Structure formats: C-alpha cells, structure tokens
Amino acid sequence: VARHLNTRGLPLILPLRNPAKAPVLPNCEAQRFAYGDLELAEQALNGVDVLFMVSAAESPTREQEHLTLVQAASVAGVKRIVYLSFAQAALDSTFTLARTHAVTENAIRQTNMRYTFLRDNFYSEMMATIANADGIIAGPADDGRVACVSQRDVAQAAANVIADIACGNHRHDNQTYTLTGSQSLSFAEIAAVLTKITGKP
C-alpha cells in the first residue's frame, strides 16, 4: 500500500515496531509504534490525517490492542480511518476473527472520525498453506464456498481509496466495501487447484 501511494506523490508516515525495517521511499517518515502502547501510538499518529489500519497479529490481546489504537487515533486528531476488516465481521459470529473485527468497527463508529471499512475475504495466498504435512485440509468447511482475494488486489484497492480521500473525495466516507475474488470455490475445488499447481495430491 505504501509503495502504491508513494508513486502518487503522497507524503506518508509509516508506524512500525522497528522503523529500521521501513521501506526506503521518498517523502516517507518511519515512526516507532506498537499496538497496545497508547502513548507511543499517539506520538506516531501525531499529524496524520488518514490512518490505514491493519489488524494486529493474532493473540489473546488483539481486540484490546485494536481498541487502544482507535483511541490513540482519536486523541491524536486523525480525521479518517481506512480499516482493513474481514468479510464476515459480526458480533454474533462463532469465528473469533470475525468478532474481533466487528468490535473494532463498532469502536471506530463511536468516534468522531470518518471511516471506510475494507472487509476482505480470505487471502488466496493463504490457501497454499492450509494443508497439513500429509496434504490434508482439516477444518469445518463442509460444503461451504469462499471467493478468496489476492493480497495485491486488496493493497491496490486500499491505495485507491486512500488516494481518493487525500484528493478531497468524500464518496468513501462512512462506507463499507467487501473485497472478494471472482470465483467462489469449495475447499475440494481449492485442493484440486493446489494439486494442479504443485503436482502433489
């Protein structure tokens, strides 16, 4: 996302746990940042108008870390949040990830910040890793289908939204977009695709 936006000449602040790992891009400034650290997050977001918020790493404290970041953004004066959420986000979901994203969305709605929620589906890049060492995909999928989306497509979509906002376009204010792939596949069909690509059953 940062590289897409940088090609459009937008000034960027990159909040990172380790600023030394920031990509070397013109007109970009790396700031030390940590999920769950309110003071550090406020400092990193000082002067930021639009925050692109990606979820924290999976952990028992992820939900609270998200809420801390939302609070920090509000206190720091961030005007808009573009939040990378999840396609099935819902408070009553049996899927922990979906509940966490729904709680985060609600917290953002309760602030004075404008928001855009990008609810992406499962990443297609993840599908190659879902089989275990024996080549078995184990999970409660049954006959369910999923339209996986490429991380590259999600990054491009996020960059397009943020660039629009930076140009003063308000059409994305308080909007929710669901990002999916073009094909809805069962896990049996996904397994067949992986077999064709890798040559392994």
Language-model features, listed with the residues they occupy:
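Oxidoreductase cofactor-interface core, primarily capturing Rossmann-like NAD(P)-dependent enzymes
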Residues: 1-25, 36-39, 46-48, 57-64, ...
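Cofactor-binding loops of NAD(P)H-dependent oxidoreductases
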Residues: 31-33
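Periplasmic-binding protein-like
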Residues: 52-54
